[in-house]
Amino acid sequence: MARLRLLLRSARLLGLVALGLGLAAWVSLRERLPGADVTPLRQRLTRWWLARLCAALPFEVRVSGEAPRQPMLWVANHVSWTDIPLLGALAPLTFLSKAEVRAWPLAGWLAEKAGTLFIRRGSGDSRLINQRLAEQLHRGRNLLIFPEGTTTNGESLRTFHGRLMASALEAGVAVQPVAISYRRDGVPDAQAPFIGDDDLLSHLGRLLRGERGSVHIQLLEPIPSQGLDRAELARQAQQAVRLALFGTAAPTQTRRAA
């Protein structure tokens, strides 16, 4: 049964990848036209395609709360690469990703064509990065970041780093905290986390072979940035996500990922 699930789901996913490549190539051609601004088209197509990708993944998705109508800096806890399509299907988002993702076969190219902003961790040029992020927010675009800086197994929360929160302050926009929880058979999902030495294809294979899990996405109360510094903004966002996921007793990890 697991083998049949893998074959059927893989076939559906391959069809979606082919469709995504075709759409990305078409947008890339449109981009070359003189004076063409394809950003609105790219965001609409990206959201449409991500919604179909989510439907092909083995998750039952439940969403609490409403997506904001005005541009905000979305900050979420990070469990897996699947966080990105799940959130991207909810609203037009510009994604921020580590530079290594650009080198992933197919997925990296699709991410680039979807308008993802890539940053190199440890580059030290936080001012320039925040300027790029603030520009996106000034243009009325929602921006998604994962302030933990890495993925977790979903059973704890790492410290939210305030370095990238400065973009919300510079643009004068609120922060939209998001809590993502993966469950399977009533307990935290051990298959969903993309951590450690996982590679994309092996992780995807495990997901496609398994039974359907569940995902709960909570869009929490936005946090106004006015009057706060980036450290306090990060602390409040982290507290909101921690309370939504675990309640007051949940621990926060402070160690860096291995």
Curated annotation (Swiss-Prot):
Effect of inactivating the gene: Mutant shows no significant growth defect.
Lipid metabolism: present as a keyword of the record? Answer: yes
Q: How does it sit in the membrane?
A: Single-pass membrane protein
Q: Which organism is it from?
A: Pseudomonas aeruginosa (strain ATCC 15692 / DSM 22644 / CIP 104116 / JCM 14847 / LMG 12228 / 1C / PRS 101 / PAO1)
EC number assigned by the record: 2.3.1.270
Give the protein name, as stated in the record: Lyso-ornithine lipid O-acyltransferase
Its domain of life reads Bacteria
Family statement = Belongs to the 1-acyl-sn-glycerol-3-phosphate acyltransferase family. OlsA subfamily.
What's a GO biological-process term for it? Answer: membrane lipid biosynthetic process
MF-aspect GO terms: 1-acylglycerol-3-phosphate O-acyltransferase activity
What is the recorded function of this protein according to its Swiss-Prot or TrEMBL entry?
A: Catalyzes the second step in the formation of ornithine lipids, which are phosphorus-free membrane lipids. Uses acyl-acyl carrier protein (acyl-AcpP) as an acyl donor and converts lyso-ornithine lipid (LOL) into ornithine lipid (OL).
Q: What keywords appear on the UniProt entry? A: Acyltransferase, Lipid biosynthesis, Lipid metabolism, Membrane, Transferase, Transmembrane, Transmembrane helix
Q: Which residues cross the membrane?
A: 7-29
Q: Name one GO cellular component term.
A: membrane
Q: What reactions does this protein catalyze? A: a lyso-ornithine lipid + a fatty acyl-[ACP] = an N(2)-[(3R)-3-(acyloxy)acyl]-L-ornithine lipid + holo-[ACP]
